Amino acid sequence: MEVTRFAPSPTGHLHLGGARTALFSYLFAKANKGKFLLRFEDTDRERSKKEYIDSIIDSLKWMKITPDEEPVYQSKKTSNHKEIALKLYEEGFAYACDCSEEQLSEMRKDQISKKQKPMYNGLNRDKNIKFSEGMVLRFKFPLHNSSAFDDLILGKISVENKEFDDFIILRSDGTPTYNFSAAIDDIDMKITTVIRGDDHITNTLKQINVFKVLDKKIPNYAHLPMVLGESGKRLSKRDGAEDILEYRHKGYLNDALINYLVRLGWSYEEEEIFSLEKLEGIFDLSHVNSSPSKYSQDLLNWYNNKYLNFLTSDELIFKLKEDFKVDFGELERGDSAISLIAKGANTLKEISEESKYFFQDPLINLESSGIGIDKKEIFMDFKNQLNEIDFQQEEIESVIGIFLKLHNL
């Protein structure tokens, strides 16, 4: 059975790129009759916050991405990770290192001066130092050949092992590091396919070596090319890299955002519109593009306009009242009014802003208009006539015609 996971660090809100990763992981699991799991990699004690955990959970819930089990918290598994790190040390797959910050700094400076890649040079690799409190444990990365895997999106990826150093698996304060903990948790959670951004490729090459020394089956990996901003550069808050719940606050529908996100790098025949239910049956990784996708505000607006107009007038009235406290149900022909506005609107917020004319009289400030007293009386008379008629096209045209003729306008 396929088991996927989404593993955010709760050091901030869920943004567009992370939401796409979560969606692809969820859809791949569902399309293969598998399980989708959620894991919070919350080992950064200073930056990980409960408010971000709650925000990520709320964002996934709004996007209809429901984990099949309760979330896993990496911070609660620290003792297990530490135990396995010590086991690797005892078996010779890791070693104790007592290098000081000063030594490491000098090492980096020397390498940079020689135009070499800054990395740990293995100074203590073969010294058989006895591990004690305050030291770090380093993973014995293979010295020769290459580390490689077949990516389900990008194809064969191979990097020579000399490009890697012996990365730390246990810090001097006794806490495990990300790459080690992530590998152990993927083993414990029985993850079969890891779907994540292509900025994790280096991490993957480290983690598969942890799997090997533990004699565990290596998961399949699929690395998603990044989402670029409209400028072609890395996505920023200015062009889409914002909290997913902000899209809701701006009046975007979750179904529209889901449809838009899945089309950021994935295609299926000539279709553009997909319900979540359909995606759960047809999604696959073979149709994911291996090139970066580009964020488009116009395309997102196009999708949202489509989904707004898929809704019935009653559904629109409900959503507008729920999210923006505007109740078209109070109007005599509110269903017709809201459907009319929705035709040209990109968001619920736009409908809300355009609806004010239905709920309040326009403010006409004749005092500051520079219009003479005689003209003011004419305008007020015209306003009063409009207030008294049934607001139908024929009556409006008749009143305007009589008014213009009466005042020679």
Regions found by a protein language model. Give the residues of each.
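N-terminal Rossmann-like or analogous alpha/beta NTP/dinucleotide-binding catalytic cores
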Residues: 1-113, 203-216
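A short glycine/serine-rich beta->alpha loop
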Residues: 8-14, 194, 402-407
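Short capping/connector residues at structural and topological boundaries
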Residues: 11, 19, 45, 77, ...
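Glycine-centered flexibility sites
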Residues: 12, 17-18, 33-34, 64, ...
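Conserved nucleotide- and phosphate/pyrophosphate-binding catalytic cores
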Residues: 50, 54, 64, 184, ...
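Conserved S/T- and glycine-rich ATP-binding loop of Class I adenylate-forming
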Residues: 88, 139, 300
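Active-site cores that bind ATP or allylic diphosphates and position pyrophosphate for catalysis
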Residues: 95-223, 228-237, 243, 268, ...
